[in-house]
Curated annotation (Swiss-Prot):
InterPro entries: Ribosomal_bL28/bL31-like_sf, Ribosomal_bL31, Ribosomal_bL31_A, Ribosomal_bL31_sf. SUPFAM superfamilies: L28p-like (SSF143800). Binds 1 zinc ion per subunit. Gene3D superfamilies: Ribosomal protein L31. This is Large ribosomal subunit protein bL31. The keyword Zinc applies. Keywords: Metal-binding, Ribonucleoprotein, Ribosomal protein, RNA-binding, rRNA-binding, Zinc. The keyword Ribonucleoprotein applies. One of its GO terms (cellular component) is ribonucleoprotein complex. Binds the 23S rRNA.
Length: 71
């Protein structure tokens, strides 16, 4: 590995919009998140097996391939 060409990695605190703070190594000085594992519904168990389909794509797929899926 060549010396002196790689950016310096430093330990930073990443702040989420929910107020949670996480530490990680990065080449940037500060980093902000919109969603993290503390506030995302999937990691909190609120999403479960729900499928969020606001445009009917899942139902359209099921209707299109219903004969194939039944066999």
């Amino acid at each position: 590995m060549k010396q002196g060409i790689h950016p310096e990695m430093k330990l930073i605190t990443v702040k989420c919009a929910c107020g949670a703070e996480h530490t990680m190594y990065s080449t940037v000085d500060n980093f902000r998140l919109d969603v993290c594992s503390e506030c995302h519904p999937f990691y909190r168990g609120e999403l479960g097996s729900q499928i969020l389909d606001t445009e009917g794509r899942v139902q359209k797929f099921k209707n299109k391939y219903k004969d194939f899926l039944e066999n």
